[in-house]
Amino acid sequence: AAAVLLDPRGRTLMIRQPNGDGAIFARLWQFPAVEAASDPRETLHNHLAGIIPRTAGWDASKLAADMTPLAAARHTVTFRNIRLLPFLVRVPRLPLLEGAQTPRLAALDHLAISSATRKIADAARHAL
């Protein structure tokens, strides 16, 4: 499950795992995401609450009601079939995270992103 956080200016939050965590998309910019075996909304909500500290001036615990499911997509990498379950999360402002970027959703082409991230961005843009 992936969260497309979107502020009123059309900006979104992009993060990357420089140390190889999340090896499939290591070192590429991506939306905050987590593997969800059961309830993707709850799993993603818990993941966001874990990676975004309250000290970032943002309270992830209030997100559950604001998570709008987007069109699911499929992505294949080597021998893995991945089902992408994105959620659009409208926020008054994006959290401040060290090392993160906040580009406009409409202008992600200048970042190194995977085709899976591109599919998620396309689903979000289509829903707007």
Regions found by a protein language model. Name each.
Residues A1-L128:
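Intrinsically disordered, low-complexity, charged terminal extensions of DNA damage-control enzymes
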